[in-house]
C-alpha cells in the first residue's frame, strides 16, 4: 500500500505510520517503509537511530517493522520488496509527494524506482490532501495526471480536517478520477502533539480519540 500526498504538508507520513501501527495491532505482520527521499521522517517521529543503515528492516514489536530507503539502497529495492512480501502480511510505503507522478513513472533515476514499483505491483495507493484551497488545487492536478496513465493499484483519498468535504467538494473531485474510498479524517491537534511529544503513535497515547478511530477504520477497510 503506497501512501502519498497531492502536495507537501498534508499528513501522509502521519497517516502511513498510524495505519501501519493499526494493522499491526489487528494482528497483521506489517512493514512500514520510508521512501520519502526528500524528507524522511518516520525514524524521527519514532525517535529511532540509524534506521537507514539497517540492511533490511528493524523490528519494533511483534507485528511491526520499519525500513528506510536511501539512495544507496534504492537499486536493491525490488529484491527487498520480494523478500518482504514473503515475510510480511502487509507493506506500507511512504512515498512523499506524488506531484508529477506520470513523469516519475518514466524516469530512470534512483529516486523514482520505488514509485515505479508501487505503480506496477501495489494493491492500493492512498492519497492525502486537505480542504485548504491550494491543496485542493494540487489534488485536482494530481487526479488529472492519474487520468492520463494506467497503474495497477486502486486509488483512495484521505482528506484531513474535512468535515464538510462531501458536501462542498465531493462531486468536483470524484468526477475527475474515480476513487475506491474517500475518507474524512478529523483534525486533533492535542492528540497529534501528544504523539509527537512521546515519539509514538496515536494508538499508544490517545486510543479513544476520534482521529485514532479514523485511522483504525481505514486500516480495517484496506487490510
Sequence positions of predicted segments:
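Acidic-aromatic/histidine active-site loop/patch
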Residues: 1, 50-51, 75, 147-150, ...
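Walker A/P-loop NTP-binding active-site region of P-loop NTPases
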Residues: 1-60
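Conserved beta-strand segments of the P-loop GTPase G domain that flank and frequently precede/overlap
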Residues: 2-4, 33, 67-68, 92-94, ...
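Phosphate-binding/switch loop-helix module in NTP-utilizing enzymes
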Residues: 65-117
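Well-ordered beta-strand positions
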Residues: 90, 123-127, 181-183
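Conserved Switch II/interswitch segment of TRAFAC-class P-loop GTPases
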Residues: 97-103, 122-140, 164-166
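Conserved C-terminal guanine-recognition region of P-loop GTPase G domains, centered on the G4
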Residues: 115-116, 136-155
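Beta-strand-loop-alpha "switch" segments that mediate conformational coupling across diverse proteins
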Residues: 161-166, 170-204, 215
